[in-house]
Amino acid sequence: ENMCTAATYKTKDFYFGRTLDYEFSYNEEVTITPRNYQLNFRNKESITNHYAIIGMAYVSENYPLYYDAINEKGLGMAGLNFVGNAYYNEPQQDKDNIAQFEFIPWILSQCATTKEARRLIEKINLLNVPFSAQLPLAQLHWIISDSEESITVEAVRDGIKIYDNPVGVLTNNPPFDKQLFALNNYMNLSNKSPKNSFAQNLELQQYSRGMGAIGLPGDLSSQSRFVRVAFVKMNSVSGEDENESVSQFFHILNSVDQQRGCCQLDDGKYEITIYTSCCNATKGIYYYTTYDNHQITAVDMHKENLDGESLIRYPLIKGEHINYQN
């Protein structure tokens, strides 16, 4: 039941990224799927020519199992845990039958915009087929975003739901309509100093900065992370250039960073933020940090041969990089 947070951010370019919070790593890699890599599907014809994709994937049997990715057109998509609510079906005759692990490649290989993705999803049936015996079905829901709009996609027992996502963030449970509704409880929070509306005849004092957001959840539960990252993202201010935008994006997601020791699982292990990503979806650059490496590492898809046929893979740089000044 690992937890994660995804967010979008727009300055002059469009940014999309996520945290992966878990107790161990599968050796995921920054993986580029070039335009002529043959994408095979269990129940659909292969796609041999498509948009190039860059993202974080666990590669098994030369297939990119993407956790989050963008394509060369600037569309981003991430899968986040949705345990207990995700529901996948047997094949249906009049639908595009797509396995859950094929969903990100299916959309990002063919769609340039969220609108195009929405049209494909209206015809889709997500299958309860695992990738392999070693890699069981992941119970997920998804955020899909371009620079204009975001949607959340949830495959639940009564079908596939497509929600408009006006905040451009996603965590885990509960279902997305309930997540959005919970923001009503925090509409009084502000980035400004509060005025005394408690009682006019009491002389109440602002004894600290930041009191306008007292009540913003600080714990690591998925509902609380949703509220917190939404507040941080919606109030975010930064410069427009690349370094300032990327730096600010990592600050947004670091507001829900999981430190080892704060979230103990029943088996005694601890959930941590294994990696944090930030994609410049406009320029096709994938930036990331890991739990032990604060230095931002980048892979630029346009420095590769995007007309190739083979996956291009970069293992994560995980050790801390410290820049000595003397």
Where do the language-model regions lie?
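Short, flexible loop/turn elements at secondary-structure junctions
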Residues: 20, 81, 146-148, 157, ...
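C-terminus-biased signal that marks the final domain/tail of proteins
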Residues: 2-15, 129-130, 137-138, 147-149, ...
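Short, surface-exposed beta-strand-loop junctions and turns on beta-sheet-rich folds
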Residues: 22-24, 83-85, 158-161, 168, ...
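Aromatic/basic-lined ligand-recognition segments
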Residues: 150, 154-159, 165
